[in-house]
A protein has these predicted regions:
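Extended beta-solenoid/beta-helix repeat architectures
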Residues: 1-100
Length: 100
């Protein structure tokens, strides 16, 4: 699994297995076959495409949008959780605001 501990400027496309312990200053898009493990912070939105997977253990200040993949939230999402398809699981103790 690829890991990043620093700060990433701009948007990020994930099509592999990627663990972010640092900060992404832009949006993150998780594509088919990609798996994001967000332990740090995303200052934008997280968009999960069909076949993608995102696990949010840390903080997302924007929206988390499931467009047909798998989303699991254990951390905090300041924006909205938008379920447009796929499977979305909010674990007990997660801090979120839901929008169907």
């Amino acid at each position: 699994m690829r890991t990043e501990y620093g700060q990433l400027e701009g948007d990020l496309d994930v099509s592999d297995h990627f663990a972010l312990y640092g900060l992404c200053a832009g949006d993150i898009t998780v594509h088919d076959g990609g798996a994001l493990h967000l332990y740090g912070m995303c200052a934008g939105n997280v968009d999960v495409k069909p076949g993608g997977c995102a696990r949010v253990y840390g903080l997302c200040t924007g929206d988390v949008v499931n467009n047909g993949g798998e989303v699991e939230v254990r951390g905090m999402v300041i924006g909205d959780i938008k379920k447009n398809g796929g499977a979305t699981v909010i674990q007990p103790g997660a801090k979120v605001r839901m929008v169907e």
